[in-house]
Amino acid sequence: MIYGIGTDIIHIPRIEQLINKYSTKFINRILGKNEITIYQSLSIKQQTNFVAKRFAGKESVAKAIGTGITSSLLLPDIEILNNNLGKPIVYIPNAAKILLNNKKLTEYKIDISLSDDHPLAIAFTVISAST
């Protein structure tokens, strides 16, 4: 059964402006520790697209959970990493797992798709669950 869906689209130049203006402070508000390590290994152009897709992805995950970004579910808490084939995998904090468990979801799967085509990045998330 589909528990929730979420989508988000972002204007990449907006992210670029925020990175240029706030630098590390902005990155730390968006990315988790593992994502920051990946971010630092990328070229400047790749960094901007990486952050834009992660921002859209995290927003779409929060929408699919049904809470949006809250004090108990912050952007850096959600990490989107890639497996060895490049597929994005969502890692959520215990607070989000508790949220889903409180909604009587014993088993769930989070699928996410990320894409960018300058000047836009988009993410789509589906949470499927068995009750």
Curated annotation (Swiss-Prot):
Molecular function as annotated in GO: holo-[acyl-carrier-protein] synthase activity; magnesium ion binding
GO cellular component: cytoplasm
Keyword annotations of the record: Cytoplasm, Fatty acid biosynthesis, Fatty acid metabolism, Lipid biosynthesis, Lipid metabolism, Magnesium, Metal-binding, Transferase
Enzyme class: transferase
InterPro entries: 4-PPantetheinyl_Trfase_dom (IPR008278), 4-PPantetheinyl_Trfase_dom_sf (IPR037143), ACPS (IPR002582), Ppantetheine-prot_Trfase_dom (IPR004568)
Residues that bind Mg(2+): D8, E59
GO aspect biological process, one term: fatty acid biosynthetic process
Annotated compartments: Cytoplasm
Domain of life the protein comes from: Bacteria
HAMAP family: AcpS
Family membership noted in the UniProt record: Belongs to the P-Pant transferase superfamily. AcpS family.
Name of the protein in its database record: Holo-[acyl-carrier-protein] synthase
The organism of origin for this protein: Orientia tsutsugamushi (strain Boryong)
Chain's gene name: acpS
